[in-house]
């Protein structure tokens, strides 16, 4: 009997040791350098030929700010709440519809699961359509086509985590801002190059040491690309790194994990979502 008990204890101890080893081996793949590189404002881009819609959207933004609805939606995505899926109707010219252009690869602002859209912007879009008494139609497309589609009359409004930027005003009229954003770096978890950085100046000092032999990733058409390549409107000088654009920030981070690029620059909220998902 003593031998049996001893054997059981040995097996139990081995099991606990194995579990401990598995836990110790579960390391993160990537991390965010939690220092804001930019100071941006998000807004929606309205068809220039619809000034009445612009006024209505601005009134709507003021209302959801004052009644707490905007904060309520943001808390769902930034504080572990339960997101609400949004369904798009089929576009029909005979119906009174609000047609929204977006890029559903920008969690937590817009993303798609199955046939439903989720994200801060998508839940706002549903509220806006209800506020206007219209049926909601969502058109999902590449990010760099979003504002263009509105200017071509293919959509009424762009809702896609859009930073207010001068060259985009050629295509749309921006609403009042509804969210403050910034760019951040995503690097591999074992990357120590930025560990001593405390300020944006510290990060930029490190970035300035990189040459063309260093590859950086970003989502095409976003502020991250402008930050890396340089942009006169923003006052970005850019860096000497080789910039590689992707259709989604998650694709850039995955390519970094695969060893093809060195780091990624992307908006703070999507960066943190991507890192959380990549690390499981």
Where do the model's predicted regions map?
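Ligand-binding clefts/hinges and TM-proximal coupling segments of bilobed small-molecule sensing domains
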Residues: 32-38, 58-95, 201-243
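Sec-dependent N-terminal signal peptides of Gram-positive bacterial secreted proteins and lipoproteins
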Residues: 4-25
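Extracytoplasmic small-molecule ligand-binding "clamshell" domains
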Residues: 42, 52-80, 92-162, 170, ...
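Bilobed "Venus flytrap"/periplasmic-binding protein-like clamshell domains
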Residues: 104-107, 117-130, 180-250, 268-272
